[in-house]
């Protein structure tokens, strides 16, 4: 890192034995390429446009569009353009799940190139001199969905993890250490999960206490923001960052992904601790030296999902770390005006070990790891996740209503 810069540049810290990510600059953060305090955003946009010009993204679309009807043979296995096609294949081939599980199509990217997303707040969208660039970038981002296919997978009941990993209870920190997935219980006192102020006042505190109780040796837990998911919500969905109001999401992320990676896990933690950036929770005020000391010890990013009612359609599904620990992740760059964030995608493997919580109850909390600072391979670095469609439910089954809170846990 360099303290002379206006922007913190994270050191690239790969897991021992992990292949290099599929990323620009060999995985080095774009914030290394700062120009006049822009945190590398100009170079990131230039690279996004160069990649569009190269045609590699269009080549993936052409491969799918020009393939004959039916299954598409990929290097990873048979993929399908549509959910229904993949489901028919699962049923025709008698692909079955164990008790409590579900055989299901899941949507993966088949593009082995980094992707770029210029966020809506970026000034590029309002610059008349860059209208042509904006059109190209918008089209390419929309085309990302055309670079995905459905693949058959099996979900296992996360409550029964001990059947698949003898001696490992899903209700323990050991499950998070090994798999990147755990379960917990919470009888929340929060009465209105659509009231962001009540959520931040009541539920954040409950989740921080849960995390400190759950992880032996944890010294601090900071819940910093949340999302609400409810397709059927009839009220105002508007997000208001200034008021710390996340709004209400009508859509569910139907693509295998993770929210953080080797770079962004450190960046997100540091910008919270030093700037309270996008922090909806309790405010913190650490000096740079104090943050360096805090981040020199182990810390993790954990997402916690709690339903408002029994989950039926669009359940949240989680993948266990050992089944993809040796697999390179693919970077997605989120370009703001003042920083370049990073999330990740993954290509399909039939060996991916997926879990869900069938009919997850309002007092059941599913937890997934988005980042762990331990890189020696002794613990999981992260999980990845997606929403999915349960084909065994009627068409009018209600969609998931839940909260997802994001946190950092420090040791």
What name fits each language-model region?
Residues 1-4, 405:
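Generic low-polarity alpha-helical segments
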Residues 342-411:
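Catalytic core of Fe(II)/2-oxoglutarate
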Residues 3-43, 47-50, 58, 62-65, ...:
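Non-heme Fe(II) oxygenase catalytic core, chiefly the N-lobe of the double-stranded beta-helix
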């Amino acid at each position: 890192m360099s303290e002379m810069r206006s922007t913190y540049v994270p050191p690239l810290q790969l897991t021992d034995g992990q292949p290099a990510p599929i990323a620009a600059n060999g995985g080095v953060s774009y914030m290394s390429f700062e120009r006049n305090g822009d945190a590398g955003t100009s170079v990131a946009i230039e690279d996004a446009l160069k990649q569009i010009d190269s045609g590699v993204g269009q080549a993936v679309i052409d491969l799918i569009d020009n393939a004959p009807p039916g299954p598409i043979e990929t290097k990873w296995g048979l993929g399908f353009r549509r959910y229904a096609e993949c489901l028919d294949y699962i049923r025709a081939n008698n692909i079955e799940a164990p008790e409590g599980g579900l055989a299901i199509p899941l949507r993966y990217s088949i593009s082995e190139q980094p992707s770029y997303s210029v966020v809506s707040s970026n000034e590029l969208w309002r610059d008349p001199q860059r209208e042509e660039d904006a059109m190209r970038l918008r089209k390419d981002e929309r085309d990302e969905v055309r670079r995905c296919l459905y693949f058959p997978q099996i979900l296992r009941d996360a409550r029964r993890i001990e059947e698949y990993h003898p001696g490992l209870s899903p209700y323990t920190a050991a499950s998070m250490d090994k798999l990147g997935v755990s379960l917990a219980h919470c009888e929340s006192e929060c009465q209105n999960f659509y009231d962001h102020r009540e959520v931040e006042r009541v539920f954040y505190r409950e989740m921080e206490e849960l995390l400190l109780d759950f992880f032996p040796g944890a010294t601090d837990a900071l819940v910093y923001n949340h999302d609400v998911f409810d397709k059927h919500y009839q009220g105002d969905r508007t997000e208001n960052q200034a008021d710390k109001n996340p709004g209400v999401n009508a859509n569910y992320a139907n693509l295998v992904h993770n929210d953080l990676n080797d770079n962004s896990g450190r960046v997100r933690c540091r910008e919270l601790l030093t700037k309270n950036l996008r922090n909806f929770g309790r405010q913190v005020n650490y000096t740079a030296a104090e943050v360096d000391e805090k981040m020199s010890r182990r810390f993790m990013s954990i997402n916690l999902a709690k339903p408002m009612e029994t989950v039926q359609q669009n359940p949240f599904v989680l993948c266990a770390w050992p089944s993809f620990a040796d697999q390179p992740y693919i970077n997605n760059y989120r370009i703001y005006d003042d920083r370049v964030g990073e999330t990740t995608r993954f290509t399909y493997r039939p060996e991916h070990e997926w879990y869900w919580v069938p009919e997850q109850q309002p007092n059941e909390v599913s937890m997934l790891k988005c980042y762990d600072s331990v890189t020696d391979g002794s613990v999981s670095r992260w999980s990845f996740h997606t929403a999915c469609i349960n084909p065994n439910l009627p068409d009018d089954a209600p969609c998931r209503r839940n909260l997802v809170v994001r946190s950092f846990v420090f040791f």
